[in-house]
Amino acid sequence: MANPTGGDSKNTLYCSFCGKSQHEVRKLIAGPTVFICDECVELCMDIIREETKSSALKSGDGVPTPREICNVLDDYVIGQEHAKRVLSVAVHNHYKRLNHSSKTDIELAKSNILLIGPTGCGKTLLAQTLARILDVPFTMADATTLTEAGYVGEDVENIILKLLQASEYNVERAQRGIVYIDEVDKITRKSDNPSITRDVSGEGVQQALLKIMEGTVASVPPQGGRKHPQQEFLQVDTTNILFICGGAFAGLDRIIAQRNKGTAMGFGAAVKEDDDKGVGELFKQLEPEDLLKFGLIPEFVGRLPVIATLGDLDEQALITILTQPKNALVKQYQRLFDLESVKLTFTEDALTAIAKRAIKRKTGARGLRSIMEDILLDTMFDLPGMDSVEEVVVNEEAVDNPTAKPLLIHTDSKKETASAG
């Protein structure tokens, strides 16, 4: 399509890939009998960059080094440097162990991972990114839906079934996959006395997870066991499946603070020495005994030898999340306003105020969208019916003052007005 018919084709040059003329693009690069425009070059660069990220540079034995894994995590996850390092080393060692398992008579044990951190701090995103880097089957399970076998709810074998589905029923690939079990703090023991009643969704689930996490040959029904009892079972060895468990563990910080205090304390009593410490700081002092007090059984804690704690995202990290990633929230809303032919601008003070509100709400990065919707709701309601609006400016007052609205800049007068309430 370097020279389409029609128009002034003799004098006009066209991109051989997208067909745009030299007048529609900024640059047109010429080669022997072909041309490529700057937009196609940028597209090619994006494709190459994505390919490079998804198949991170390999070390000599085909396993990405911890630094390479950490560098790719940096592209997707903001902050949480300590957790990234812990995860990078654990995952590198796990897949190195698989590649060298038959080369020596020393058997290397598997190191499953426990991620502990407040809501919205990036636990799930870290696990998803790891699977993308390593190009292995990945599945995510919700621990709150699991029950012991024989009770209403999902069996733990359903987790392995989801992993099989992610690997298109390739058993060999599934046996090298990653399973992320979310909300694992919700399956804690419901009572200190386990004999009072049957705990089918708490301690019972922990007991059921023990064998598949440690390594066993699980019989997995390909169509789900309860609806098709007559089907053939697939045998899946879970020995080399990496299990990552994550949870917010609300209240665990108080257990750690009480242990640090070193004395018995009444219910709800404040720990003055730890008042200025954030949740993330207290999580760094975590000991296995704290998890036992929280309600995890000793056998379950023992099968999660690698513990990575994540802290609350600070103000600067939240501002970065708002503006930097490819699909950052600010860019998403700017695109929405672009569809109305209106420019959307956030002042630096406004971004700082949004981050401060998210910190107060204690919802982490997840709370940012809710705050943005709150600020822009009335403007997005009125804007489609308004003429001559060229730009919407969100300043600090529009964020902090519930009655204040973003400023509207009109084309004709260039006069700033408050958005109609």
Curated annotation (Swiss-Prot):
Binding sites annotated in the UniProt record for ATP: P118, T119, G120, C121, G122, K123, T124, L125
Q: Which GO terms describe its molecular function?
A: ATP binding; ATP hydrolysis activity; ATP-dependent protein folding chaperone; protein dimerization activity; unfolded protein binding; zinc ion binding
The protein's matches in CDD domains, at most eight in alphabetical order, are given as:
RecA-like_ClpX (cd19497)
Q: Does the keyword DNA damage apply?
A: no
UniProt keyword list: ATP-binding, Chaperone, Metal-binding, Nucleotide-binding, Zinc
Q: Any idea where the ClpX-type ZB domain is?
A: 3-56
**InterPro entries the UniProt entry points to:** AAA+_ATPase, ATP-dep_Clp_protease_ClpX, ATPase_AAA_core, Clp_ATPase_C, Clp_protease_ATP-bd_su_ClpX, ClpX_bact, P-loop_NTPase, Znf_CppX_C4
Q: What is a biological process (GO) this protein takes part in? A: proteolysis involved in protein catabolic process
Residue sites binding Zn(2+) per the record:
C15, C18, C37, C40
Alphabetical GO CC annotations of the entry are:
HslUV protease complex
The UniProt family comment states: Belongs to the ClpX chaperone family.
- Subunit structure comment from the entry: Component of the ClpX-ClpP complex. Forms a hexameric ring that, in the presence of ATP, binds to fourteen ClpP subunits assembled into a disk-like structure with a central cavity, resembling the structure of eukaryotic proteasomes.
What's this chain's function? ATP-dependent specificity component of the Clp protease. It directs the protease to specific substrates. Can perform chaperone functions in the absence of ClpP.
Q: What is this protein called?
A: ATP-dependent Clp protease ATP-binding subunit ClpX
Which source organism? Answer: Paracoccus denitrificans (strain Pd 1222)
> What does the record give as the organism's lineage?
Bacteria, Pseudomonadati, Pseudomonadota, Alphaproteobacteria, Rhodobacterales
